[in-house]
């Protein structure tokens, strides 16, 4: 190999290594403010099934902060964040916070998952419309998990694609709980 080609190859490798280093050290994506393609009333009225087959909607949590998490049993980041959501549900439930997980999978599979992993907050099944609702709430990539936080007036205020860090969610819920105390 000639010296010219060696120099070019070393330069190219340096550029690739620098790019990889920059991408690896990039801070995690912050939750985005939601600009949904759907009205809050439509989201609150959307029908889901609980694990016993009953009809449910987010509208039943009127006056509460709702953390809506789109997930699947096969999704590794979903499984990783669920224990944190379980802890946060226990911590903030008395302050009017309600976590709800929604999956497009079949009820028996979700029920088995809930029992196996000890998930006690509501897990609902939404069927084929779940991916479209998630997209309309800001999930342009169509990936899981996708979390949307609604304020007490049922307006979506924050959404995040990917696992939601426990400390970030805890800070957000503390702010939302403080707002409700002041009112």
Model-based region annotation:
Residues 1-45, 183:
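N-terminal targeting signals for export/organelle localization
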Residues 38-40, 45-66, 89:
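A short beta-strand-turn-helix
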Residues 61-64, 94, 120:
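Active-site acidic short loop of glycosyltransferases
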Residues 69-74, 104:
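Aromatic-flanked redox-active Cys/Sec active sites in thiol-based oxidoreductases
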Residues 73-80, 143-146:
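C-type cytochrome heme c attachment motif
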Residues 79-118, 128-135:
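Structural microenvironment flanking redox-active thiols in thiol-disulfide oxidoreductases
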Residues 115-119, 126-175:
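Thiol/disulfide oxidoreductase modules built on the thioredoxin-like
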């Amino acid at each position: 190999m000639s010296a010219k080609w060696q120099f070019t190859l070393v330069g190219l490798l340096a550029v690739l290594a620098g790019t990889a280093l920059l991408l690896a050290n990039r801070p995690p994506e912050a939750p985005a403010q939601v600009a949904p393609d759907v009205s809050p009333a439509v989201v609150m009225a959307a029908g889901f099934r609980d694990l016993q087959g009953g009809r449910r909607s987010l509208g039943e949590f009127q006056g509460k902060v709702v953390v809506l998490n789109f997930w699947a049993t096969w999704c590794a980041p979903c499984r990783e964040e669920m224990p944190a959501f379980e802890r946060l549900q226990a911590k903030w439930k008395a302050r009017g916070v309600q976590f709800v997980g929604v999956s497009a999978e079949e009820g028996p599979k979700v029920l088995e998952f809930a029992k196996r992993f000890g998930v006690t907050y509501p897990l609902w099944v939404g069927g084929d419309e779940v991916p479209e609702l998630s997209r309309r709430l800001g999930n342009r990539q169509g990936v899981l998990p996708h979390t949307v936080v609604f304020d007490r007036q049922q307006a979506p205020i924050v959404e995040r694609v990917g696992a939601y860090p426990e400390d970030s969610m805890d800070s957000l819920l503390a702010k939302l709980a403080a707002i409700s105390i002041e009112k």
